[in-house]
Design a protein with these regions (language model features):
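Zn-dependent metallopeptidase/amidohydrolase metal-coordination segment
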Residues: 156, 162-170
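Structural motif
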Residues: 33-35
Length: 170
């Protein structure tokens, strides 16, 4: 892709499947950076369908080893989230905006359909092995991870593997 070797994969659903795939990419393919993309559900009311969130921090919203440690804290690591490098997040935001703005036909079709151009945010993600299908579940995650803009089932596991193997993640 533009002179850079790229490995594209589908990890399957869930944290374990995503972690397995990330580990394979790092160990077998010797990737130097992982660009994670996927589908997420909005936790923040300002997000609309089609908006893009480039992650700053990843939380496992279903991590709960209380009373041994606080909710969200990853056992033996003493932390509750995994962060991207700020410059990688910013580069990701800029790339997504450039990509969206480059497709004039797509933007025209959105306008004709009465839809707005997707907004791009840098923010926090919450991941867990739960499909969030109710307001009650959504509110529970928002309560436990108030900074999270959206929720998925894989990204925090990939972030943990990337940190374990010192592989940058965007």
């Amino acid at each position: 892709l533009d002179g850079v070797q790229v490995v594209g994969v589908f990890s399957r659903w869930g944290k374990v499947a995503a972690a397995t795939t990330a580990t394979e990419l790092i160990l077998k393919f010797k990737v130097q950076h992982i660009l994670f993309t996927g589908i997420a559900g909005a936790l923040d009311d300002t997000l609309n369908v089609g908006d893009v969130v480039v992650a700053r921090n990843f939380y496992q919203h279903d991590m709960d080893a209380r009373p041994l440690m606080p909710r969200l804290q990853i056992p033996l690591l003493g932390k509750d989230n995994f962060s991207t490098k700020p410059e990688d997040t910013q580069r990701g935001v800029e790339a997504v905006k450039k990509f969206i703005d480059s497709d004039k036909d797509f933007l025209r079709k959105l306008h004709l359909a009465g839809l707005s151009k997707p907004a791009v945010y840098a923010g926090d993600m919450a991941s867990g092995d739960l499909f969030v299908s109710s307001t009650k579940m959504r509110n529970s995650i928002r309560k436990n991870v108030p900074s999270a803009l959206c929720v998925d089932m894989e990204s925090a596991a990939v972030a943990q593997v990337c940190e374990d193997y010192d592989c940058p993640l965007t």
